[in-house]
Amino acid sequence: MKNLIRLFLILFVAGIAIGTHTSCSEDSDCSIAGRAMINCTLYRMPAPSETILQNDTLHSLTVTALGTDSIIINNQKKVHTLSLPLRFTSDSTVFIFYYAYREDPTLCDTVYIKQDNTPYFESMDCGYSMKQSILGLGHSEVELDSIYISNKQANTDGTENLKLFYRNRD
C-alpha cells in the first residue's frame, strides 16, 4: 500500500513538472531580434582596370533616421557591414550617414528608400508583423558613389540587400 501511494505521488509530481515545462516552452520570439532588417555591405568603387570588387571599411559611422530622434548606429568604428530597420508606419525611410559626426556633421550622405509594407498575422502572442521589400532608392553623393539592390526583401538571416559603393578615399 505504501508503494502504491509513493508511486502515485511520484507520478503526480512528474505530471505537474512535465505539464509546467511543456506549457512554457512554446514562447514566441516577438523581440526586436526577430525583426527583418536591410543588410548592407560596403564596397570600394573599383577602378576601370579592376575586375574584382573589394570590400571597404569606414573609419567611423553614425546613422540616424530622418524624422526621429533615434540613433541607429552610434559612432561605430571600422564599419564594413550594417543592418538597418525600415519604418512600419510609412512607405519610405530616410537614413542619414554621418562619417565624422562630432568633427564635421555636414560630412554626410542621405539614403532614401521607398518600400512596400505588407502586414501579416504572425501569432496570437506577437500579433501582426510586417513583410517589407525595397521598391526603389535614391541617395546623395558626398562620399557614397552608388547603391546596388542585390535582394529586395528585408530579412532576418543576414542576407545582403544593398551594396554601398564608396569612392576611393586613399
Segments and roles (model prediction):
Residues T51-S70:
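Extended low-complexity, serine/threonine- and proline-enriched intrinsically disordered segments
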Residues T41-Q54:
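Structural motif
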Residues M1-G34:
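Bacterial Sec-dependent N-terminal signal peptides
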Residues C24-I32, M37, T41, K78-D170:
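Extracytoplasmic cysteine-anchoring/structural motifs
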Residues I5, L9, A47, V79-T81:
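Intrinsically disordered, low-complexity segments enriched in glycine/proline and serine/threonine
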Residues I72-K78:
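Short beta-strand segments within Ig-like beta-sandwich modules, predominantly Fibronectin type-III
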Residues P46, G67-D69, Y101-E103:
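Solvent-exposed strand-loop boundary residues in beta-sheet-rich modules
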Residues D27, P48-E50, I71:
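Intrinsically disordered, low-complexity segments enriched in polar/charged residues with Gly/Pro
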